[in-house]
Amino acid sequence: MTGAPTPTRWAGVPLTDRRAERRALLVDAAFRLFGDGGEAALSVRSVCRECGLNTRYFYESFADTDDLLGAVYDEVSAALAADVEAATAGAGDSLRARTRAGIAAVLGFSSADPRRGRVLFTDARAN
């Protein structure tokens, strides 16, 4: 039984796009693992297993798990900053209203997905 070879996951995807996609998969996997289980759940193998990539692709994007965790932190903090900026921009000119909107945005951001709070406020290594 000979058939045409099955296309690979990355067939037809340009190299730079493949790398970016794999990096995003690794960051998302690390977010889930760290967010659910803390730093103890994070290893090169666990991240690669979580996203279905081999370790070669891990080291294509990151030097070590500290580097990866920094990327997770950067992504989550950028999302928080965007939420706070949007909330404060829509709160009017009053400093009090803008402050309340910013605080509410931080609390809402963390409570909407508690893993975000864990990444930002607990367990995190110094990055």
Where are these regions (language model features)?
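A short, mixed-charge helix-start or loop-turn motif at secondary-structure junctions
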Residues: 8-15, 62, 66, 87-92
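Short, basic, alpha-helical segments at the C-terminal edge of helix-turn-helix-like DNA-binding modules
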Residues: 73-81
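Helix-turn-helix
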Residues: 25, 33-67, 71
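Short secondary-structure transition hinges
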Residues: 108, 115-127
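Charged catalytic carboxylate motif
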Residues: 25, 79, 98-102
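Basic, helix-initiating cap at the start of DNA-binding domains
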Residues: 1-37, 46, 50
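Hydrophobic alpha-helical connector segments
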Residues: 71, 85-115
